[in-house]
UniProtKB/Swiss-Prot annotation:
Binding-site list for Mg(2+): T26
CDD domains with a match to the protein in the record: EF_Tu (cd01884), EFTU_II (cd03697), EFTU_III (cd03707)
Reaction equations catalysed: GTP + H2O = GDP + phosphate + H(+)
Protein name: Elongation factor Tu
The organism of origin for this protein: Shewanella amazonensis (strain ATCC BAA-1098 / SB2B)
HAMAP family, A to Z: EF_Tu_B
Region: G4, residue numbers: 136-139
Localisation per UniProt entry: Cytoplasm
Gene assigned in the entry: tuf1
Keywords assigned by UniProt, alphabetized: Cytoplasm, Elongation factor, GTP-binding, Hydrolase, Magnesium, Metal-binding, Nucleotide-binding, Protein biosynthesis
Positions of the UniProt region annotated as G3: 81-84
Pfam families: GTP_EFTU, GTP_EFTU_D2, GTP_EFTU_D3
Subunit structure: Monomer.
Region named G2: 60-64
Length: 394
């Protein structure tokens, strides 16, 4: 079969399967791939191809992840599936696989299990915005009431973590039966795909968001003023627009009087581009690496936040020994390191390499941040952990 041409015309959405071990995440991934390829065209991936997840490195952290793609009539999906629980934890915390929505797989034969809860909590902490439930192995449960009970339990568990448990879609199906070509169960996979299309809104593209550029370098150009350089993270900056300089020091306002790229003058700089931005009336010593340029009023500097952190194992080049409360490493945000102190959850005395943990961080100077911002934890330039801002305190 000829490979379908990748169409840029369809909106692109990132999703993934989450849930307890052996509840059928990988089987469901294979079933979606097969049923959608059969129904709408495309290439089907087998269970064994997906299960044999290649090893990747994200910020020095080893993660096993399978990536597959599939199409519905209106969208193109990129879907991630991980073999082990630890891979999910690392994936979600580093943002290696940023999900616009997740498919929570729960076996009807078991109901919600410890990792079901943990993956829902992680989704909440790292900011996965939407969850759809696929109740799997429903062919093995004869009792209609039991299925209703499991569905109710899952909905309550999601509500507990502030997802709209009463309103989100729950599809009862059997991934294995669908994979074996049973038409009735294949219909449930189509139903799941339709739920993805209708329930997960089209993600806002980086270019449509409010302008933000982390400052990497500062130069003064005689007769012209101060130029800051960096890669535009989101949005568009046009010549003549007001910008704020946020982080480290007090926030100040200035105007963009020029945009340069590869020594050419432009009218604007866009998300993904490396630009130099000329700032009106700003002195060279008033800006520094680690600050951000942003559209006024869209991002604030903060020093204290709750985070979800994965601590690198010794094998990944992390610490060989645990750390305790009072630990003072550097937190690397976007372009710079800031020293901070940590508070561990009650009853936690120490954190071992390879653990994931919730911690409250207090930085010695403020950094421009939103919930969902990723950071690295470093000691003398060496990465020992990865984290995500879950909740801003002050």
């Amino acid at each position: 079969m000829a490979k379908a041409k990748f169409e840029r015309t369809k909106p692109h959405v990132n999703v993934g399967t989450i849930g307890h071990v052996d509840h059928g995440k990988t089987t469901l991934t294979a079933a979606i791939s097969h049923v959608l390829a059969k129904t709408y065209g495309g290439e089907a991936k087998d269970f064994s191809q997906i299960d044999n997840a290649p090893e990747e490195r994200e910020r020095g952290i080893t993660i096993n992840t399978s990536h597959i793609e599939y199409d519905t009539p209106t969208r193109h999906y990129a879907h991630v599936d991980c073999p082990g629980h630890a891979d999910y934890v690392k994936n979600m915390i580093t943002g290696a696989a940023q999900m616009d929505g997740a498919i929570l797989v729960v076996a009807a034969t078991d109901g919600p299990m410890p990792q079901t809860r943990e993956h829902i909590l992680l989704s909440r902490q790292v900011g996965v915005p939407f969850i759809i439930v696929f109740m799997n192995k429903c062919d093995m449960v004869d009792d209609e009431e039991l299925l209703e009970l499991v569905e109710m339990e899952v909905r309550e568990l999601l509500s507990e973590y502030d997802f709209p448990g009463d309103d989100l879609p729950v599809i009862q199906g059997s991934a294995l039966k669908a994979l074996e070509g049973d038409a009735a169960w294949e219909g449930k996979i189509i139903e799941l795909a339709e739920a993805l299309d209708s329930y997960i809104p089209e993600p806002e593209r980086a270019i449509d968001k409010a302008f933000l550029m982390p400052i990497e370098d500062v130069f003064s150009i005689s007769g012209r003023g101060t130029v800051v350089t960096g890669r535009v993270e989101r949005g568009i900056i046009k010549v003549g627009e007001e910008v704020e300089i946020v982080g480290i020091k007090d926030t100040t306002k200035t105007t963009c009087t020029g945009v340069e790229m590869f020594r050419k003058l432009l009218d604007e700089g866009r998300a993904g581009e490396n630009c130099g931005i000329l700032l009106r009336g700003t002195k060279r010593d008033e800006v520094e690496r680690g600050q951000v340029l942003s559209k006024p009023g869209t991002i604030k500097p903060h020093t204290k936040f709750e985070s979800e952190v994965y601590v690198l194992s010794k094998e990944e080049g992390g610490r060989h020994t645990p750390f305790f409360k009072g630990y003072r490493p550097q937190f690397y945000f976007r372009t710079t390191d800031v020293t901070g102190t940590i508070e561990l959850p009650e009853g936690v005395e120490m954190v071992m390499p390879g653990d994931n943990i919730k911690m409250v961080v207090t930085l010695i100077c403020p950094i421009a941040m939103d919930e969902g911002l990723r950071f690295a934890i470093r000691e003398g330039g060496r990465t020992v952990g990865a984290g995500v801002v879950a909740k801003i305190h002050e």
